[in-house]
């Protein structure tokens, strides 16, 4: 009798937990039609060395379409300067691995060129028609998926001509939640220090589940960087891993946590992170990326295992080195060598500039108290803007982002923005 009672109590406990989960995250009856799913796909860079970002977005677009997301429910932002770039040996095509399957054809691009910026991105999320193109029209019963790929630095992600700071992004997410613009929201971000967009910032009560390519202090990695005909990298490691995971699985049987754990395992050069409402990990990926049970066709080349991976900030120099190696024209080779020399000098100048700023800061009195995360983010935004104005921008050279961590740490240690900005002005004018 005692054993039966214990068994009954256990069953009741399981049912209670299940009931609580189902109450919080009930699978919509509309799952089959996918009418309640929206996606925003963003490649936040331009320039041929950043080929991989637009290839990632194109690949992701086709996977979402194959899984049943309607084209009118997918919003894409990409500069669109790669497919027909003079440096692309395959005009009108973008590849995401060495199989050379074209992912560019058939992609509907909603925002191109100068329209790819942080302000337009936030307008798209808010459903603000002044964005000038397609915007999210999601409501309280809709599920939304956001994928962003580009460069980053502590507390920001980059666009071709500006940045999106973590605090502004979080403010927008809270706006979407309070205005019932979604039921559940999933965000995947590929960028250096991408974890800093959510760490200590994203609360667990917004029905948002986020994963990032890296933690808050490290680079993310690019992959397929050794193509015999294309001089730059074809994919980002984290991005390729999640896209292929979705491409090759029936998403009605694949949970968010299963995808996260597999992508984390396969992305072995950085530390993939998870933030927000982790209870959502029990939900199926199909609720956000489509429920059509279609994986890769039997006639398709199977996805490749990533190889030849390189830290994302090293890609511009890597691309230039490969261009030099692959050209047989002596005049072109000489010209490329001159460009390489200039880029190396600029890298050294950026490093020397930061060393001088650190030297100035070493003369300042160490603060007695650390800054809160809000204070840190406010400080870094001011400091980054000053550094961009007086010294260098992230768009000029990705390695700038690596030095932003020094400025971020000063803010976190409690130094005021005014003190740090004075040091920047003293060195950069």
Swiss-Prot record:
Region described as Disordered: 288-309
Its EC number(s): 3.4.22.34
Keyword Transmembrane listed: no
Any one GO MF annotation of this record: cysteine-type endopeptidase activity
Residue span(s) of the pro-peptide: 20-31, 292-429
Keyword Hydrolase found: yes
Span of the signal peptide: 1-19
Reaction it catalyzes: Hydrolysis of proteins and small molecule substrates at -Asn-|-Xaa- bonds
Pfam families, alphabetized: Legum_prodom, Peptidase_C13
Gene Ontology CC terms: vacuole
Family matches, as Gene3D superfamilies: 1.10.132.130, 3.40.50.1460
Name of the protein in its database record: Hemoglobinase
């Amino acid at each position: 009798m005692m054993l039966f009672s214990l068994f009954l109590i256990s069953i009741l406990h399981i049912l209670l937990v299940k009931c609580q989960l189902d109450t919080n995250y009930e699978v919509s009856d509309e799952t089959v039609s996918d009418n309640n799913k929206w996606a925003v796909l963003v490649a936040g860079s331009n320039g041929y060395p950043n080929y991989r970002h637009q290839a990632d977005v194109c690949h992701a677009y086709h996977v979402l379409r194959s899984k049943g997301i309607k084209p009118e429910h997918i919003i894409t932002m990409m500069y669109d300067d790669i497919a027909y770039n003079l440096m692309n040996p395959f005009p009108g095509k973008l590849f995401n691995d060495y199989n050379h399957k074209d992912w560019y054809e058939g992609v509907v691009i909603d925002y191109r060129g100068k329209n790819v910026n942080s302000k337009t991105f936030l307008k798209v999320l808010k459903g603000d028609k002044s964005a000038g193109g397609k915007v999210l029209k999601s409501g309280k019963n809709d599920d939304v998926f956001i994928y962003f790929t580009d460069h980053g630095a502590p507390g920001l992600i980059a666009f071709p001509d500006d940045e999106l700071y973590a605090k502004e992004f979080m403010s927008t997410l809270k706006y979407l939640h309070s205005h019932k613009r979604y039921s559940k929201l999933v965000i995947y971000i590929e960028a250096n220090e991408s974890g800093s967009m959510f760490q200590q910032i994203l609360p667990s009560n917004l029905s948002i589940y986020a994963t990032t390519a890296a933690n808050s202090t490290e680079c993310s990695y690019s992959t397929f960087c050794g193509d015999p005909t294309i001089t730059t990298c074809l994919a980002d490691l984290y991005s390729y891993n999640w896209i292929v995971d979705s491409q090759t699985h029936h998403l009605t049987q694949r949970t968010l946590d299963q995808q996260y754990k597999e992508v984390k395992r396969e992305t072995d050069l950085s530390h993939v992170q998870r933030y927000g409402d982790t209870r959502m990990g029990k939900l199926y990926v199909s609720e956000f990326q489509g429920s059509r049970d279609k994986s890769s066709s039997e006639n398709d080349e199977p996805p490749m295992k990533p190889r030849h991976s390189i830290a994302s900030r090293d890609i511009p120099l890597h691309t230039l080195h490969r261009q030099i190696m692959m050209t047989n024209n002596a005049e072109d080779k000489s010209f490329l060598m001159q460009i390489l020399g200039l880029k190396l000098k600029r890298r050294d100048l950026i490093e020397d500039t930061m060393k001088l700023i650190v030297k100035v800061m070493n003369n300042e009195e160490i603060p007695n108290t650390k800054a809160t995360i809000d204070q840190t983010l406010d400080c870094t935004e001011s400091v980054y803007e000053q550094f961009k104005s007086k010294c260098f921008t992230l768009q000029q050279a990705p390695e700038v982002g690596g030095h932003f961590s020094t400025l971020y740490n000063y803010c976190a240690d409690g130094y005021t923005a005014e003190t740090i900005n004075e040091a920047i002005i003293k060195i950069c004018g």
